[in-house]
Amino acid sequence: MKFQKLKGTRDYYFQDSNKLEIIRNAFFTSAKKFNFSFLETPIIENVELFKRTSGDFSDLVKKELYSFEDKSKRQIALRPEGTAPALRAIVENNLLQKHNKFFYFGPMFRYENPQKGRQRQFFSGGIEWLEKQSPFTNIEIIFFAKNFLDTLKIDDYEIVINWIGHPEQRKNYLDHLKNYLNQFENQLEEISKERLKNNALRILDDKIESQKAFVKNAPKIHDFLPKESLENFYQLQDLFKKFDIKFKVDPFLVRGLDYYSDFVFEFVSTNQNLGAQKTLLGGGVYSSLLKELGGENIEGIGFGFGLERIMEVIDLNNFKDDAKKITAFASNEDDLIALLKLRNNFGDLIKIDCINKVVNFKKIFKSKQIKESDFLIFKELNNAQNEVSLKNKFNDQKLVVDLINPNIENIKKYIKENSD
């Protein structure tokens, strides 16, 4: 029987696996640069963790959660996002005693309709910085995100920001928003009619609803927030300008999870390859999330990104591997053993692909493996010395390499000089 992958999943190979590795490495490099510590959490968690952090009425919990009952009658969920598991691990293991900046990367799961840049199993990365928030911590996260995308040579995006206040400050606004949207309930999509009862904010940045005139004319949250809250937002905008970071304020940007407070942001692609789903990464501040999970009453800020969406916009031509392909082969077992020893002695200094069987010299030069190589290492026929030839396949320039004491610097120099 021939099996196929499940709907909403994908296999990564060749170009896709190269892109995965490039994005992951770029993210890890940026995280280390900004002094974030890697945190790995289990793929499975208690369902209640996500209900507590995302809200019982969130789309994530109501519609997208992969959950099941295990043999011990526990309600288990495949993690749909990384913030809640990361904060759970921080609290459970008392990690704040040693550090307060963490990052994660791995597979997540959401039961939703697969589309370009969105899968049911997907790779996601993110960061969490637990510290009292200020415009300077906010802008530092923007620096991190920009550095990450710059490393990937992605520059066709815009930074969209908003200020949504604390949950208590939003109550009055939510009442006005619901009253306003109730007038247009018959014009809302079915999912938005449900949101209107318990999660009206989500209607504002829904990709379909946000295009409707009555949604564009909805009350704006800034008209309902206290002056001192907005002053922080204005100060943050001034910092953006002082650092010459272009941005756009979108009063309807709210992000998809209920725990956000004050500053929220998205890096939105202007690349036409992405279709409707254009957010490359997004995040914001949360004020009481750590306390909700039994930790200290400390604010935090973070962002998350989906690997699949970024894969759609990076260009592999910007990440060409300049390493030359070197293939070693032998016509007898003794020579093969000598070549394998030579290859192992080089370690990571020089990459050599060794054909692990005795070959016929006349036939091997016609093989695909040799045709795709830049340099060849082999022992010349009838050569009784402890030496092999390193040969440029294109110009016939040759370097004799001593098998007993190979001069690695000479080999590297030869490869460099004969690589043009």
From Swiss-Prot:
GO BP of this protein: histidyl-tRNA aminoacylation
Keywords (A to Z) from UniProt: Aminoacyl-tRNA synthetase, ATP-binding, Cytoplasm, Ligase, Nucleotide-binding, Protein biosynthesis
Keyword Aminoacyl-tRNA synthetase in record: yes
Pfam families named among the record's database cross-references: tRNA-synt_His
GO molecular function: ATP binding; histidine-tRNA ligase activity
Gene3D superfamilies tied to this protein: Bira Bifunctional Protein, Domain 2
Signal peptide start and end residues: none
Location, primary (coarse class): cytoplasm
UniProt family annotation: Belongs to the class-II aminoacyl-tRNA synthetase family.
Subunit structure: Homodimer.
NCBIfam families (UniProt xref): hisS
Protein name: Histidine--tRNA ligase
Gene name per UniProt: hisS
